């Protein structure tokens, strides 16, 4: 059977649907190459001296790991000179990075979390890179933060690479979700699963149970019902999974279903959530919806949230459609009582 490379897939998608512009195809290929380089760095670990803290912090106030910094630099260096981008934004940078004048500029904006789940780096658990692509409002003009302030519905592509037992690139350009596995011998990503679909129902949930006492009542209600199992109102037993790496948890959900929850909690009531809207929640919500799932912040569809700042946070509930709709309904019922 003929193996389909990422490049061939993108070319054939353009022929079939006429939705992938040549510049977007080249941009996705550059991001994929950067993910290969990050995968190589991750796989070397202690051999290359890349484990441990970098001794610095990011704009979120989080301690940066050495691989956080390395992955961020790899993505910047790979993408700044190709002529496809006007600017980039990253979890690891205070502000956006405008393409220098010495390079040609394109009409796309690239946003990324260079290494999601970095608390897992030193313990050798799956981590990943998340990315999102937007169109510039007005190509050719000076980039401002306002150009990035687009709802998730405006994404033209999104994906992630998960660095685990295999390195897998998961991608959508608005025509379903497709998975590509890195063939290290050939040095290329090969299509290994097409048109991924998330089951509408599930018996698995992913949440950090240690935070239960801080959750809002709708989230506690949902989890309490899951924990009650076949003796409770749901009439079935649930399993809990939690990897503390959004990429790994979402990859499991895309593979076999489930619901992922990182909700608001009362420790920081002024913050609507922990995860970042622009380069974590939006790309993952795009992927999940393209795979037949749903993604909400409890009150509204994540892709409809209007961003107001680059590092905006949001509550995230995503995965199997019927479970996400149930949690959303619980939030609506709770709001109606207030």
From Swiss-Prot:
Pathway: Carbohydrate biosynthesis; gluconeogenesis. Transmembrane segments: none annotated. CDD domains: FBPase. It catalyses: beta-D-fructose 1,6-bisphosphate + H2O = beta-D-fructose 6-phosphate + phosphate. It is an enzyme of class 3 (hydrolase). Mg(2+) 1 binds at residues 91, 113, 115. Coiled coil: none annotated. GO terms for biological process: fructose 1,6-bisphosphate metabolic process; fructose 6-phosphate metabolic process; fructose metabolic process; gluconeogenesis; sucrose biosynthetic process. It comes from the Bacteria. Its EC number is 3.1.3.11. Disulfide bonds: none annotated. InterPro entries: FBPase_C_dom (IPR044015), FBPase_class-1 (IPR000146), FBPase_N (IPR033391), FBPtase (IPR028343). Mg(2+) 2 binds at residues 113, 116, 280. Its main location: cytoplasm. GO terms for molecular function: fructose 1,6-bisphosphate 1-phosphatase activity; magnesium ion binding. It is found in: Cytoplasm. Signal peptide: none annotated. Substrate binds at residues 116-119, 208, 274. One of its GO terms (cellular component) is cytosol. Keywords: Carbohydrate metabolism, Cytoplasm, Hydrolase, Magnesium, Metal-binding. Its cofactor is Mg(2+). Binds 2 magnesium ions per subunit. Homotetramer. Belongs to the FBPase class 1 family. This is Fructose-1,6-bisphosphatase class 1 1. It comes from Cupriavidus metallidurans (strain ATCC 43123 / DSM 2839 / NBRC 102507 / CH34) (Ralstonia metallidurans).
């Amino acid at each position: 059977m003929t193996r389909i490379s990422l490049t061939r897939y993108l070319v054939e998608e353009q022929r079939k649907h006429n939705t992938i512009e040549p510049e977007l195809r080249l941009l996705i290929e550059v991001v994929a190459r950067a993910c290969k380089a990050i995968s190589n760095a991750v796989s070397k670990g202690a051999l290359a001296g890349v484990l441990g803290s970098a001794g610095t912090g990011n704009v979120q106030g989080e301690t940066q790991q050495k691989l956080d910094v390395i992955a961020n630099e790899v993505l910047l260096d790979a993408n700044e000179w190709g002529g496809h981008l006007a600017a980039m934004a990253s979890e690891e940078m205070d502000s956006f990075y405008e393409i220098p004048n010495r390079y040609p500029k394109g009409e796309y904006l690239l946003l990324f979390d260079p290494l999601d789940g970095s608390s897992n780096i030193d313990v050798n658990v799956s981590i990943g890179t998340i990315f999102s692509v937007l169109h510039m409002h007005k190509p050719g003009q000076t980039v401002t933060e306002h150009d990035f302030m687009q709802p998730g519905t405006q994404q033209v592509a999104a994906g992630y690479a998960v660095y685990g037992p295999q390195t897998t690139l998961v991608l959508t350009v608005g025509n379903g979700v497709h998975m590509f596995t890195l063939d290290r011998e050939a040095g290329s990503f090969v299509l290994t699963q097409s048109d991924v679909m998330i089951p509408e129902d599930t018996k698995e949930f992913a949440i950090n149970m240690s935070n239960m006492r801080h959750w809002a009542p709708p989230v506690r209600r949902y989890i309490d019902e899951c924990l009650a199992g076949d003796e409770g109102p749901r009439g079935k037993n649930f399993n809990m999974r939690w990897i503390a790496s959004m990429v790994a948890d979402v990859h499991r959900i895309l593979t076999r279903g489930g619901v992922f929850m990182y909700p608001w909690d009362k420790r920081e009531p002024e913050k609507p959530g922990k995860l970042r809207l622009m380069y974590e929640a939006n790309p993952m919500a795009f992927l999940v919806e393209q795979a037949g799932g749903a993604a909400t912040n409890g009150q509204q569809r994540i892709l409809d949230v209007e961003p107001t700042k680059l590092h905006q946070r949001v509550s995230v509930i995503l995965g199997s459609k019927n479970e996400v709709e149930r949690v959303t309904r619980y939030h609506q019922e709770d709001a109606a009582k207030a």
